Amino acid sequence: MYRPSCLSYVLLVANMWSFAVCANAFIYGSYDPSHNIPIVALMTLCATGLWLSTSVVSFGIRYVRVRVSPEKTQNRTIYVSSGLPHFDPVYGVVKKCEPMGGGPAIELQVNPSWIHLLPTSPAINKVEVGQESAILGSTYSVVETGGEPKSLVAVKSGDSTLGFGARVYHEGMDVLMVPHHVWYNDKPHTALAKNGRSVDTEDWEVEAACADPRIDFVLVKVPTAVWAKLAVRSTKVLAPVHGTAVQTFGGQDSKQLFSGLGKAKALDNAWEFTHTAPTAKGWSGTPLYTRDGIVGMHTGYVDIGTSNRAINMHFIMSCLVSKMETLPPELGYREISLEDVGLRSFEFLEVEIENRGKVKLGKREFAWVPKGKAWADMLDDDDLPLPPKMVNGNLVWADAQESFDGALPLNCLRAAGRNVLPPKLNLVTINSPVDPPTKQVACPSEIVDHRLASLEKCLENLLQTLSQPQQKFSQNSLSSGGLKGDQELKLAPCYSKQESLFPPKPRATSSKPITTSSPGTPGRSPLPVSGKELGPSTQSSSKLSRKQRRRRSTKRPVQGSPSPASPPPTRT
């Protein structure tokens, strides 16, 4: 409530007296110009009005100049933990938190004195931050700029790092080795980075790939110009050995990297192994380096805080990706047939390799699944073409799924190229006399004698050839039982061979009779050839008889064309 001051009361009394004087002087006509009181009263009233006007104006000015602003209050933001703690190689144990009222999430560094209050192990990385895991008891080391391996490269998606890969040598070309879940991520890859420099990625050709999480790899054909711009060199892939020391590399970018050390542990399956090297967020796909090269590629964790998992790229590139038909035996890997898979007591893992096909993996063996179906399996299919139908005794090909020419009737066009009526079904029986069987005419004795003489001449040449290396031995050795049996075995096939190679043919007629030998020529008998023993006395008598027959045959030459059944003597 407004309370006037004493000055206000004095002004009020003075203005009331001045108003009364002015009213008496000017209104009621009692004004005397010689008196000054009315003038003073009038001046008092004017000064009071002027003062009031000035006060109102000054109040208005002050009112306008006053600025009204909202009241300032203290805002309080509450953040809620939205993930399990994970270990960061730079900041230690970190938790992801989000504001209660909405907004961007932050990462909270946990005080080491509060680690024991966390519900789970602080040395883990769960699905929220990747498939990597730090190993309890292991440490991280800071890598100097340019001190990382020359083949290491980072895969970027904008300003975030999806993972790491390496340039490796494979069958005359350099390819980028990277996990499948990194290259085909929900966030598309945009660049390859190395030591603070990056090159945009394109739709490059893929040499081979596998989307199975247990065989998680991609081999990308990156142009040589990209490698040259990033100064990335290639390295070789080696087979892992149990207990080998391995080293991993990673970080939030390609310029500030960290590394971890561990050991490789072999498993029963040749395509995978475990290691104790620590990893962190964004390290997926980091190669496992040794002193001589790369022995594997990190793909995830097996036991949180204890071991990580890696794939054996040497087995994959040598057996599943390589185009070599044979494998070196020193590798210890064996390819088997698909039928042998069912004979094994252990299970096989079936995966599909892009640009290669399906393959079954079991321990240190693998078998390729053939493409398509076997011929025997195709016979059991129900999608075979429909056969023609029988309608009124005729085959109808209209509904059959086979190609045919409907304009040409079947079995009506002959080789002569003219239309011929089909044969009638009702044929007239015709009786005809049956010809008597023809009698076989025996071979003349002259032909038999001629063939026998030719055969004996061939056998004589053969015996002379066989007897030449035996002249150095005595008569006792010639008459031994072993030599007799040997000669019989050697002579018997020659006789059968001559008869089988030169079958008898009809002989042309001649104007003169053929006289080949004297009437004393013995008949055809296989006994001198294979059935009769050839002792020393028998050989001498047979040689004399053959010489006499040869002389007689030379004195009486055979006239006419020679018989094709008597071949020239064969040298053996």
UniProtKB/Swiss-Prot annotation:
Signal peptide: none
Biased composition (Basic residues): 544-555
Enzyme Commission number, as recorded: 3.4.21.-
Domain spans labelled Peptidase S39: 135-330
Tagged with keyword Transferase: yes
Site feature location: Cleavage: E132, S133, E325, T326, E402, S403, E499, S500
GO cellular component: host cell membrane; membrane
One of the Pfam families matching this protein, by short name: Peptidase_S39
A single BP term in Gene Ontology: proteolysis
Lineage: superkingdom: Viruses
Molecular function terms from GO: serine-type endopeptidase activity; transferase activity
InterPro entries (UniProt xref): Peptidase_S1_PA, Peptidase_S1_PA_chymotrypsin, Peptidase_S39B_luteovirus
Record-annotated membrane-spanning stretches: 7-27, 37-57, 77-94
Annotated region described as Disordered, given as residue ranges: 498-572
Compositional bias (Polar residues): 508-520
Entry keywords, A to Z: Covalent protein-RNA linkage, Host membrane, Hydrolase, Membrane, Protease, Serine protease, Transferase, Transmembrane, Transmembrane helix
Post-translational modification as stated in the protein's UniProt record: The polyprotein is proteolytically cleaved into several chains by the viral protease.
Residues annotated as catalytic: H181, D216, S284
Record-given protein name: Polyprotein P2A
